[in-house]
Amino acid sequence: MVKESIIALAEHAASRASRVIPPVKLAYKNMLKDPSSKYKPFNAPKLSNRKWPDNRITRAPRWLSTDLRDGNQSLPDPMSVEQKKEYFHKLVNIGFKEIEVSFPSASQTDFDFTRYAVENAPDDVSIQCLVQSREHLIKRTVEALTGAKKATIHTYLATSDMFREIVFNMSREEAISKAVEATKLVRKLTKDDPSQQATRWSYEFSPECFSDTPGEFAVEICEAVKKAWEPTEENPIIFNLPATVEVASPNVYADQIEYFATHITEREKVCISTHCHNDRGCGVAATELGMLAGADRVEGCLFGNGERTGNVDLVTVAMNMYTQGVSPNLDFSDLTSVLDVVERCNKIPVSQRAPYGGDLVVCAFSGSHQDAIKKGFNLQNKKRAQGETQWRIPYLPLDPKDIGRDYEAVIRVNSQSGKGGAAWVILRSLGLDLPRNMQIEFSSAVQDHADSLGRELKSDEISKLFKEAYNYNDEQYQAISLVNYNVEKFGTERRVFTGQVKVGDQIVDIEGTGNGPISSLVDALSNLLNVRFAVANYTEHSLGSGSSTQAASYIHLSYRRNADNEKAYKWGVGVSEDVGDSSVRAIFATINNIIHSGDVSIPSLAEVEGKNAAASGSA
């Protein structure tokens, strides 16, 4: 067999060596071979002695959800009022204390929903609305928020050179003047208005396209806005510094945040907020580095909804903190229900690979991953019994139970799965901790079955396959069943098993000897079937604890097949409240499995009667 394999390998090698497959030449049908002729790299700020790389995130930021405004405006089919209400209450229940609910000056629907939020928000939740820097729109927005316990007016103005020059044809001085004018009007209509004193008014200004704005101009325009608003330490002004379009790597954004944080005056009266989009796929990284660089507040959406490629995913940012031992002050204990609301209201599915929330993020299909996870759980269970609480499981940075998931879905089994995957499912579904050799054998059967179906196997399918493959507890095939038995001890090592078994309709007496109950029963069945069985492996363990404890026994028997006299092996499993009974069940499960396979024949009626007669004669 080895020689044939070597010859086959040599033939394969010779076959490939004789063929020439030329390299693939890139066509560049649409992309440019040299993109530098069309695109230029971002001109990053020069920041010396940056401090943020040495910082750590040690506390939660202020969070603002803009799902109902930025997220909703980007949907192909925006939310209905009822969906907005459901979403709003889910955000409140998660723990968001700042929620941007609308653009109330844009439509009556947005205005009406703002009024709903004002009337139904808990006292500690601030309702935020976005508005352009125009007088009539600002007045309408203030009207929508009147009566709120806590409210934030959010104005914005594009400050990047490209937007000022191409879109608005506006100088820097004109931009500053417009931002200050809007700020003064908001102040006049809110915190300076005697009739509005029941509301705690806050103000947010966004230099839109901040990440593409020269740093010194971003500071200059915000200084002017701050002077117009006159914030306090108790109620600081919010400067939202958005990566409206992500144009550079996250470290550049962090440099921009640190530059702003170290150059803006009266820092104690300023709340720096991030608002990262995901155009380059780095929204989460930019947000986290922004916090390292001094940001106090984070804006975004659940699961990253938003314009184009979306806003930063607040679930990911929050849970990244959580898995580093820092409480995000947001409760995602039932993340599946959050996912359901987001998908139903947004009418956009969340990727199965989305961090933390995706259906597959706590699942392992790879055999090596499954084996590592199984070993991790086994060790962790032992450590927890000793009082250790730290979570240390390979491939699982988060305990699935913390977000409302169970362990059943952690390991999924397909044709690529190894012994650990199938063994994990059996451990979770039947409580059986399979011996290593049995794991290897069963995983092969599982892989073959998954291959034949061309899909993943469900837990109940794997359990059914196991019960059939190993005649679990002698429940599948019962060609021979035990009626009664007794084991007597002779001397220090010899045991004699006597009993009766039912073969078909006949009751047959059996007898065997060995150095223990297991070997003597195996000898008795060997005598009955005229086949020499031997115990190749035997293990047992307890199931459960306390009064409900059961024992599981695993028997691996060797024998020679009737057809060709070749040596073969079979496993069997028995479970009972009594360890002796569980081992007996395991032996009969194995013997009946061997008979069912056709490797060994059941005695004929004449043979059974002959054995009974012989037993009676010897008696």
From Swiss-Prot:
Annotated Gene Ontology cellular component terms: cytoplasm; mitochondrion
Locate the residues binding a divalent metal cation: 70, 275, 277, 311
**Entries under PROSITE patterns matching the protein:** AIPM_HOMOCIT_SYNTH_1, AIPM_HOMOCIT_SYNTH_2, PYR_CT
Q: Which residues form the Pyruvate carboxyltransferase domain?
A: 61-336
The EC class name is transferase
> Which reaction is catalysed here?
3-methyl-2-oxobutanoate + acetyl-CoA + H2O = (2S)-2-isopropylmalate + CoA + H(+)
Q: Which InterPro entries match?
A: 2-isopropylmalate_synth_dimer, AIPM/Hcit_synth_CS, Aldolase_TIM, IPM_Synthase, LeuA-like_post-cat, LeuA_allosteric_dom_sf, LeuA_N_DRE-TIM, PYR_CT
Show the GO MF annotations: 2-isopropylmalate synthase activity; metal ion binding
Source taxon at top rank = Eukaryota
Recorded metabolic or biological pathway in which this protein acts: Amino-acid biosynthesis; L-leucine biosynthesis; L-leucine from 3-methyl-2-oxobutanoate: step 1/4
Residues spanning the membrane: none
Its BP terms in the Gene Ontology are:
L-leucine biosynthetic process
What keywords are annotated for this sequence in UniProt? Amino-acid biosynthesis, Branched-chain amino acid biosynthesis, Cytoplasm, Leucine biosynthesis, Metal-binding, Mitochondrion, Transferase
**UniProt-listed Enzyme Commission number(s):** 2.3.3.13
Task: Tell me the null mutant phenotype.
Answer: Retains 20% 2-isopropylmalate synthase activity and grows in the absence of Leu; a double LEU1-LEU9 deletion has no 2-isopropylmalate synthase, does not grow in the absence of Leu.
Alphabetical list of Pfam families matching this protein: HMGL-like, IPMS_D2, LeuA_dimer
Q: Which CDD domains match?
A: DRE_TIM_LeuA
**Cofactor dependency:** a divalent metal cation
Q: Which family does it belong to?
A: Belongs to the alpha-IPM synthase/homocitrate synthase family. LeuA type 2 subfamily.
The cross-references to NCBIfam families, in alphabetical order and at most eight, read: leuA_yeast, PRK03739.1
**Chain's role:** Catalyzes the condensation of the acetyl group of acetyl-CoA with 3-methyl-2-oxobutanoate (2-oxoisovalerate) to form 3-carboxy-3-hydroxy-4-methylpentanoate (2-isopropylmalate).
The miscellaneous remark of the record is: Present with 6630 molecules/cell in log phase SD medium.
Q: How does it assemble?
A: Homodimer.
Protein name according to UniProt: 2-isopropylmalate synthase
